[in-house]
Regions:
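Alpha-helical promoter-recognition and RNA polymerase-docking modules of transcription initiation factors
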Residues: 2-114
């Protein structure tokens, strides 16, 4: 999934309603570089922030899918992925992210009759 600008409404939903920090690719790269140089605060900021791909995913879902329940499920799956993959350095992160997020959305759809 390629990064595209996140719609203001989606950014507001993620940041205000869900308390998620949305980073642009440039912001993410800067924090990765600072973390790699030993900046502990940058590392902690990366842990608190979520990735542009999550915003893209939610942005491309139908509006009635933008629920706290689905977002919580996606965040939980994202945390599982980041325990295994370093998104700053691992080229396979995008493929794993895409596969796992599709699975999480599919499970949610089945459970909610969508």
């Amino acid at each position: 999934m390629e990064y595209t600008a996140i719609e203001p409404a989606v950014r507001a939903f993620l940041e205000e309603a869900e308390g998620i920090i949305v980073l642009s690719p440039a912001e993410q790269a800067a924090l990765c570089a600072r973390r790699d140089e030993g900046d502990r605060a940058a590392g902690e900021a990366l842990l608190r922030a979520q990735y542009p791909m999550l915003g893209n995913l939610i942005q491309h879902l139908p509006r009635d899918f933008r629920t706290p329940e689905l977002t919580a499920r996606l965040l939980a799956r994202l945390r599982e992925i980041t325990e295994t993959f370093d998104f700053c350095a691992d080229a396979g992160f995008g493929r794993v992210f895409s596969r796992e997020m599709r699975a999480a959305v599919r499970e949610w759809m089945q459970e909610n009759g969508k």
